[in-house]
Amino acid sequence: MSTTSDATSVRPPREPVQELLHTLFTELFQTERSADVHSTREADRLGGAPPALALRLVAAHAQGAMGEIVELAEARGFADTRAGVGVGSMFSQFRDGLADHLISRERSYRVTLLGMRHGMDVVRSVRFVAEAAGDTGLSTFCQTWLEHRAPLVDRVAAELAWFARNPESALEGGKGQWKARLAGALGLG
């Protein structure tokens, strides 16, 4: 009779600081994937508008950082944190499939910006825990990441002014004029 749980398949318990880092890495994978996916989607929706370039710069940084994050996670025995991307994907699909149809371009842009700021806070948390654990390599990565990402996110935030100058575009639904189409379909428009 074979058992499904043998000694080699059981993970030894982690120290609390390592468990916290593991949890943060799961969240880091989610936020970095979101920075790529949502920034790219928002940029595509905005076409040639100036905020699109700022979003694409964040997406490019996220794409470049993901490889390093994978290496850092694997070196610390956190390879399974990439599974967290699946949860993030589910929320991204919900947002793309429904929520972005219900909110304006400007609000969708701000939600994307909020996610970027959340990602920066996650990286700050990773850095603080890495410093507490004496993990200089991880702490240095986080500091460098923040030095590159912060000005990009600031640029995205500065582009909020574009929506003020273009209120018609700001008020459009994330994927077009769904309200007008719905009203037309119901014979109300």
Where are these regions (language model features)?
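A positional/architectural concept
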Residues: 39-43, 47
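Alpha-helical scaffold segments that form or flank carboxylate-/histidine-based iron centers
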Residues: 17-28, 47-68, 108-112, 136-149
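A structural signal for well-ordered alpha-helices, especially hydrophobic packing surfaces
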Residues: 36, 63-73, 94-98, 120-123, ...
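Conserved alpha-helical segments that form or flank metal/cofactor-binding pockets of metalloenzymes
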Residues: 49-88, 156-159
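Carboxylate-rich helix-loop segments that flank metal/cofactor sites and access channels
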Residues: 2-8, 71-111, 172-184
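Preference for long, well-ordered alpha-helical segments
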Residues: 112-189
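Acidic/histidine-rich alpha-helical segments that form the ligand environment
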Residues: 24-40, 90-141
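Disorder-to-helix initiation segments
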Residues: 2-28, 35, 51, 101, ...
